[in-house]
């Protein structure tokens, strides 16, 4: 009986690290975080998305503090994904196609430091992939200017308030109107030549 219990414990504990290896994180800032969740949520291999704040000087910032533009935080989305099913390089492709990489003042109708675009690398491998992806996009000549999206080292990520999570699902009418009114879809179509993923 004791041998069976020990074997069961070894099997269970041995499986835990394998399960943990099937989860990785990516963090991208692309303007309004409401609009950055849907393109990633649709991808096979993405387990969850969380809207939040990163890169600032204040602990546990609120939406009001961040949108006032005085905390140094970016609105961002944290993506939990299974690297056996989707690679970080694919996440980068989706990120680029859902932002305006040549706008240094924010994204679409949202202007200010909190709405700038950035890739927050969690390790050296992500940094290398992000830098290579940015360089390739710049070199392609497809955009009407230089890519200004920064690749930064990830700092502490703070989840935004609950009412911001899955906003596009909870408030589909308001979300659709916001995207249209902000000019997000028309600018993405202009930049990339294809309708954006919503």
Role assignments for model-derived ranges:
Residues 2-5, 21:
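Histidine-/acidic- and/or cysteine-rich, low-complexity loops and terminal segments associated
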Residues 4-15:
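Bacterial N-terminal signal peptides
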Residues 19-198:
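Flexible coil/turn and secondary-structure edge motifs
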């Amino acid at each position: 009986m004791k041998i069976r219990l020990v074997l069961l414990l070894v099997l269970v504990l041995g499986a835990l690290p394998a399960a943990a290896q099937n989860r990785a994180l990516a963090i991208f800032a692309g303007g309004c975080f409401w609009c950055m969740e849907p393109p990633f949520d649709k991808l096979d291999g993405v387990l969850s998305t969380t809207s939040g704040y990163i890169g600032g000087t204040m602990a546990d910032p609120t939406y009001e503090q961040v949108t006032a533009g005085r905390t140094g935080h970016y609105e961002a989305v944290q993506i939990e994904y299974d690297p056996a099913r989707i690679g970080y390089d694919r996440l980068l492709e989706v990120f680029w196609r859902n932002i305006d990489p040549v706008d240094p003042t924010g994204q679409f109708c949202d202007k200010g430091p909190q709405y700038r675009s950035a890739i927050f690398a969690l390790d050296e491998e992500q940094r290398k992939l992000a830098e290579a992806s940015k360089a390739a996009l710049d070199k392609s000549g497809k955009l009407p200017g230089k890519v200004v999206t920064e690749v930064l080292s990830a700092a502490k990520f703070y989840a935004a308030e609950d009412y911001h999570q899955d906003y596009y699902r909870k408030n589909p009418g308001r979300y659709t109107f916001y995207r249209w009114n902000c000019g997000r879809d028309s600018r993405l179509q202009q930049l990339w030549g294809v309708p954006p993923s919503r």
